[in-house]
């Protein structure tokens, strides 16, 4: 089987924690779950991350990422704008929305600095506010990364960031973090498959119903002591 090394290294670049888009400063409600006592050790951290990954990310953010990628591939700029707006509207708290806007803006700066695209990059720059989902799907398309592989990289970055937040906020040891990362990483193919099915059905199958996550994210806005911005 032929392996495209350019695609693999591009995937590594997009998924690398060294990519300067600020993901390390966010926990997406995990820190509030720790503060409330829901997450308190390695097993509860793993359960939390797994539940959010399969119950929220796979049902909403992942299919929207695929739809955005397909829109870029078709040069359907109107659909890209609509999907970006849809995703931003699905961010249920100010912290979650600010997070994706800041990271989307940062990835846009990288794309501009590295010359990732011509006319399409101009179209990306015109989207304001710009979500990370839209910017990342664009970068994957421009770098000739297959859709499912780009989504896998996007998902791995999300998982890795959640594990890193657990290490800092609970705290956990490095080995415990790698154990959790390994177990949840193995769920990526299942997540991609579900996301593909939902994306094929359009927005009617996109579902981000997660009241506990929204409540915890709201509480985090006024949490007395915290390490993360979300």
UniProtKB/Swiss-Prot annotation:
Please tell me whether the keyword Glycoprotein is annotated for this protein: no
What are the GO cellular component annotations? cytoplasm
- Where does it live in the cell? Cytoplasm
- Listed GO molecular functions? nickel cation binding
The organism's superkingdom is given as Bacteria
Key words, A-Z: Chaperone, Cytoplasm, Nickel insertion
Q: Name one Pfam family in it.
A: UreF
**Is Chaperone there in the keyword field?**
yes
Q: Which family does it belong to?
A: Belongs to the UreF family.
Which proteins does it associate with, and in what oligomeric form? UreD, UreF and UreG form a complex that acts as a GTP-hydrolysis-dependent molecular chaperone, activating the urease apoprotein by helping to assemble the nickel containing metallocenter of UreC. The UreE protein probably delivers the nickel.
Its annotated function is as follows: Required for maturation of urease via the functional incorporation of the urease nickel metallocenter.
Q: Can you name this protein?
A: Urease accessory protein UreF
Gene that produces this protein: ureF
């Amino acid at each position: 089987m032929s392996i495209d090394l350019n695609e693999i290294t591009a995937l590594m670049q997009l998924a690398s924690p060294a990519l300067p888009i600020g993901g390390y400063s966010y926990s997406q409600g995990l820190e509030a779950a720790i503060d409330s006592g829901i997450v308190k050790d390695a097993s509860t951290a793993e359960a939390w991350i797994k539940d959010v990954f399969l119950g929220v990310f796979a049902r909403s953010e992942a299919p929207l990422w695929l739809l955005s990628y397909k829109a870029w591939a078709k040069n359907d700029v109107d659909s890209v704008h609509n999907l970006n707006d849809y995703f931003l509207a699905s961010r249920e708290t100010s912290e979650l929305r600010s997070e994706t806007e800041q990271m989307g803006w940062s990835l846009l700066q990288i794309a501009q600095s590295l010359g990732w695209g011509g006319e399409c990059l101009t179209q990306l720059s015109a989207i304001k506010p710009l979500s990370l989902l839209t910017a990342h799907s664009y970068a994957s398309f421009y770098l000739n990364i297959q859709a499912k592989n780009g989504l896998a990289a996007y998902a791995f970055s999300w998982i890795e960031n959640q594990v890193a937040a657990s290490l800092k906020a609970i705290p956990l040891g490095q080995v415990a973090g790698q154990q959790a990362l390994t177990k949840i990483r193995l769920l990526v193919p299942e997540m991609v498959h579900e996301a593909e099915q939902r994306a094929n059905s359009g927005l009617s199958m996109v579902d981000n119903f997660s009241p506990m996550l929204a409540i915890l994210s709201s509480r985090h806005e006024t949490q007395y002591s915290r390490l993360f911005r979300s």
